[in-house]
């Protein structure tokens, strides 16, 4: 199968921000006396939609407003992500795909404003035809965004390769019919990714 489109996840796949996310979550756990979260512990725990992470970790969502929790995470994340970089060779790979005539897009659980600001900051916006993020900062499922991308491109799902770094990326690809490839240097550890059976 010759792919026509490459669909990228952003956080952890192109942007090397797993450490920043782990620190943001760690601050939230410490505040609530729920223990500590290292980078490796985070990579074992992270699930989408992210509300599941909070529910499974002991956050009392009957007493705490979920939107306030999301806002707290974003405040922490923006503090720690200021020093993040792109993944090694990310620009090289983007350029190679561009040279091959592949059309590239981003589908992200990140809020659209933060996503577009980060893409602009790193100067790589020209590589992407569509940059799709969430309307809010709740890090919900990306399935609807993937379906929206299919509509925008008019391309058959089977002609699209989704490259991500989480089990959820595999789930999204499977749900909408994309092919999927996963990288293990992002938000999920290799053991969890191997269990999906994706390359």
Question: Where would I find each of the regions flagged by the language model?
Answer:
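Structural recognition of alpha->loop->beta junctions
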Residues: 122-132, 192-199
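Surface-exposed amphipathic alpha-helices with a cationic face
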Residues: 91-99, 150, 170-174
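N-terminal helical cap/lid subdomain that shapes the substrate entry/recognition surface
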Residues: 3-92
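Acidic, Mg2+-coordinating phosphoryl-transfer loop and its flanking beta/alpha structural elements
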Residues: 108, 161-199
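Conserved H-loop
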Residues: 35, 125-129, 156
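Short, acidic loop-to-helix structural element flanking the phosphoryl-transfer center
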Residues: 78-106, 112-116, 143
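A short, structured active-site edge motif that brings together acidic residues
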Residues: 42-45, 124-140
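Conserved Lys-Pro-Asp/Glu-containing loop-to-beta segment of HAD-superfamily phosphomonoesterases
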Residues: 2-5, 142-171
